[in-house]
Amino acid sequence: MTPKRQFRSALVGEHQFISRFMSNDWELRGPDGVVARMRRVASTHTSLVWLPDGRKLELEPAGWGTVVAVGDSEKAKIERQSWWGRRWEVSGATFGYELTSDPTPRRWTLRIGGHPIGRLAGTAWSYNRLDVHTDVAVPVHALILSWHVIARPWEAAAAPRVLKPLAAPKAL
C-alpha cells in the first residue's frame, strides 16, 4: 500500500508557480511535487484552488484592493496598502506579512516587521513562472494570495461582483 503524502500547510525553501503560456491553469510545485493547483476564472476575477488534502478554496474580491481566500470560512486575505499596488498586507488568523514590490521589475519580497523572509520573482517577460524562496515557513494561503496579486494585479483590484451575475430579485 502506498502511503498518502501529508499536506504541508506552511512551506519553506524553493517552490514555483508554473503555468503554460496563455493558460488559466497553474500549479504550485515544490521539491516533493505539486503543493496546490489553481485555475483562474477571469470573467469573475476569481481563482479556484485545490489543495492535496482535498480542500478547495476560492480567491475572490472583497472590496476595492482586497482579495480573500474562502473555503468553509475565510482563511486569509490580502489588502492593498499603496495607491499603485506596490505594497500589500497578507493576513490570516495566525500570520501577518507585508508583500512589497522591489525596484527591480518582477521582483517582490515578503516581510515581517520590515525584515525580508521570502522572495518572489517572475521571469524576464512574463509571470507564467513565479519562483518563490522563503527563509522561514510561510503558510500556503499567504503564498497563493501573493501569487494572485502578482500574476493578475487588475483582478486583485476589482470590486466584488463586478462581473459575477447576481441572482434575480425575488418577487414579492
What are these model-derived regions, one by one?
Residues 1-172:
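Intrinsically disordered, low-complexity proline/glycine-rich segments
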